[in-house]
A protein has these predicted regions:
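Extended, low-charge, aliphatic-rich alpha-helical segments
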Residues: 2-102, 142, 152-318, 327, ...
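Well-ordered mid-protein domain cores that form the structural environment of catalytic cofactors
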Residues: 95, 100, 106, 113, ...
Length: 564
């Protein structure tokens, strides 16, 4: 009884563990499979043209014959079909194909010896292959098994020369043997093409890759692919991770994407979890902070440029001295005097260059000094001419909300305003909370998912009192303008680079259409091969290793009648 109760308690957890919702889902439809078939046929033709057939030799009474150097000249594959077969299979059929051959003949009859070439044709070739798809231990899509059956309905050869009648007499033995040998070589060639070469193509699909110096993306398959009569569905984890804690898992409580459409070649769906994990990872990396520092107020202004750094909370972005950020061994990258000063740690990063260094706009600086004029004199009158510093720090991981009406991102942050007297501790003037809502335009370009953000709502308020919040009302519009003109371009500079979608190399999206749903969005697109299968496979084919002992070259067929 106790065991049964324990099982009932564990059952919900077990069901959740067995069916973790995907953050990214890809559906390939029958239309997409038709395009794959066209490229696949070219690949199959190339593989069959390279098949090797063993020599055929024998004896019939006083006739000795030898058939060698069999070469495929041409293939005709007029009827082929590639379709889905539930539950995990792809079926590839070729019917009524023909294969043109040429081979070398040798014949000895008593003292008569003949040598030459023969053209032959195999007609009514039928090939039936079934590929089983599954995920391997690393979460990568693989062809795990393949069955193949090949048959040749008929084969004929044209003979000429003085011994033509003799060859026609022996044609039954020669043609029957050649048909058997040829049919036995078709399936091994296709098995190697599927289990070795096509799997090497699937190895180009990104599974766990680094996006930049801070985060990575996990595209491992959660389960084996689901195949219906018209579609193939792939469930990917679709989780970003902080590179400092690569094994940390972020629980997925988002709505599972559901793809119902079948009109386009391929559909890609992303849940809110996909975007939330990206922002959570950047938050963990400590890079969602920005610091702006103005010039010192004096009768003769310093000609130096303002510093600007986008870094984590620490010496560069967490309230330390502005010049401390330039010391060796610090934790960020800062712009000072139009130069980028490198730091030993990679936890801080900046997306602007020296030509676009950030600084507190003069109008905003004047407004801030006027707003906090009384506070400055009450706290430290001697610091009235000190440079002004603004530190904007995200206080919690941003959250993404996807609705049929659009996609938005909610961000909570705090803004610290302080004066930085040279050689003395900073004087904090105000610490205010900030809530913003960004609209997100998601689009697919090539094979990269890109996001363009725009500031929609903005609100600041004091963390100390409602009275101070009222006093900060005049700063609302200037600070919103600051975000729109200086900070949003920096963010979009990063998000427009995008992240790669898990597709093999050489395959791209075209004619993309994004559709929003409740809790997820889908991208419907067509497929395009920018590279052929053979080109990609040859690119990643491992270089052959030299054998320890020289491999003997195959011997040329004998021209000595006595060696027949």
């Amino acid at each position: 009884m106790a065991a049964s109760s324990l099982l009932l308690l564990l059952l919900p957890w077990l069901v959740t563990a067995l069916h973790s919702p995907p953050g990214c889902k890809i559906r390939i439809t029958s239309k997409g499979l038709d395009l794959v078939k066209q490229e696949g046929l070219r690949f199959v033709e190339q593989e069959l043209e390279n098949i090797t057939v063993s020599d055929l030799h024998g004896k019939e009474g006083q006739f000795h014959y030898n058939i060698s150097q069999v070469k495929v000249l041409d293939l005709q594959l007029p009827f082929s079909n590639l379709h889905f077969q539930p539950q995990q299979h792809l079926v590839f059929n070729i019917n009524n194909a023909s294969i043109s051959l040429r081979f070398r003949r040798q014949l000895l009859y008593w003292f008569f010896y003949d040598i030459g070439s023969i053209n032959a044709s195999a007609d009514g070739v039928r090939i039936h292959t079934v590929l089983q798809l599954s995920k391997d231990e690393t979460g990568r899509l693989k062809i795990s098994n393949m069955t193949c059956n090949a048959s040749i309905a008929r084969m004929h050869a044209g003979f000429s020369g003085t011994l033509r009648k003799i060859y026609e007499f022996l044609s039954t033995f020669i043609i029957t043997g050649m048909r058997y040998l040829l049919s036995q070589q078709i399936c091994p060639a296709l098995n190697h093409a599927g289990l070795v070469l096509l799997n090497s193509l699937l190895d180009t699909v990104p599974v766990r890759n680094y996006v930049d110096e801070h985060i990575g993306i996990d595209y491992s398959l959660l389960r084996d692919p689901t195949v219906s009569m018209d579609t193939l569905d792939l469930d990917f984890k679709g989780m970003f991770f902080y590179r400092g804690k690569e094994n940390q898992e972020l629980e997925n409580h988002a709505v599972e994407p559901v793809i119902k459409e079948t009109e386009r070649m391929v559909y890609v769906a992303f849940s809110e979890y996909f975007f939330d994990s990206a922002m959570h990872s950047y938050f963990q990396a400590g890079v969602l902070a920005i610091e702006l520092e103005g010039e010192k107020v004096s009768s003769t202004r310093s000609p130096r440029f303002a510093q600007a750094a986008l870094c984590r909370q620490g010496p560069c972005g967490g309230g330390g001295e502005g010049r401390d950020a330039a010391r060796p061994g610090g934790a960020g990258l800062c712009l000072q005097s139009r130069e980028v000063l490198s730091r030993s740690s990679s936890h801080c990063w900046i997306t602007t260059d020296s030509a676009s260094s950030l600084q507190v706009p003069k109008d905003l600086e004047v407004l801030l000094r006027a707003t906090f004029f009384g506070t400055i004199f009450m706290l430290n009158p001697a610091a009235v001419d000190a440079p002004l510093r603004l530190v904007l720090q995200v206080s919690a991981p941003p959250r993404c909300v996807i609705k049929p009406s659009g996609t938005s991102v909610s961000v909570s942050a705090f803004l610290n305003i302080s004066l930085v007297p040279p050689g003395r501790p900073a004087v904090q003037l105000s610490s205010m909370a900030m809530e913003t809502k960004l609209s997100a335009k998601v689009f697919l370009q090539g094979k990269a998912l890109r996001v363009l953000l725009d500031l929609r709502r903005f609100r600041i308020y004091s963390k100390q009192s409602a009275l101070e919040s009222l006093a900060l009302f005049s700063l609302q519009a200037p600070l919103k303008t600051l975000l729109q003109l200086t900070i949003m371009p920096i963010i979009n500079e990063r998000t427009k680079k995008g992240v790669q979608i898990p597709l093999p190399e050489g395959m791209d999206f075209t004619r993309e259409v994004v559709t929003n749903h409740a809790g997820f969005l889908t991208v419907g697109a067509d497929l395009h091969f920018s590279k052929g299968l053979r080109e990609v496979i040859e690119k990643y084919r491992p270089a052959p290793t030299a054998p320890a002992h020289p491999t003997p070259q195959p011997e040329e067929p004998s021209v000595d009648p006595h060696q027949l």
